[in-house]
Amino acid sequence: IDFGNLTAQSLGFGASTGGSETRGIFMFSMQSSSPTRTVVDVIEFVTISQTGNALDFGNLTAASQTHQCSSSPTRTFKYGGFNPSRSKGIEFITTATTGNAQDFGDLTRAVGRGAACGNATRGIYAGGEDDAALTDEAEKIEYATLGNAVEFGDVVGSGREYISAVSNRVRGLWS
């Protein structure tokens, strides 16, 4: 079944996703137009209960690539990324209301290519690549309070990049 299309067919490379029970959010990182790729700051959304094309939501505070997202019931969060250097930035949107992303705080390190997940109250970013090397470190934010992330622990195994994460109310998994 065809759900719909993104607003620009060339968007989609490196998108991270989040949302709520009613909206799906796409935070894009690259526009792939032959022969070049451009880093972008585009946010789009779909209404999950109905088919149709994605609509413009707003923009990230800065264009970046290889960032990751997690969501609470009311907000979607973007962590890190590159453009061209690594970022410590955490941004958020209020999922139910269109508009531009806002600054939330910073990760403890500049990083990209990791994975994020969360539950209703907490988001966790782990893995990826920081300035030194691949990392297995995890850090957390409390969704309700603007501020910086704090160290949370490590994911099992040596550092990895281009990984995925999924979670429910009590556990997060990285692979």
Give the ranges of each region predicted by the language model.
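Polar, enzyme-active/binding microenvironments
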Residues: 1-175
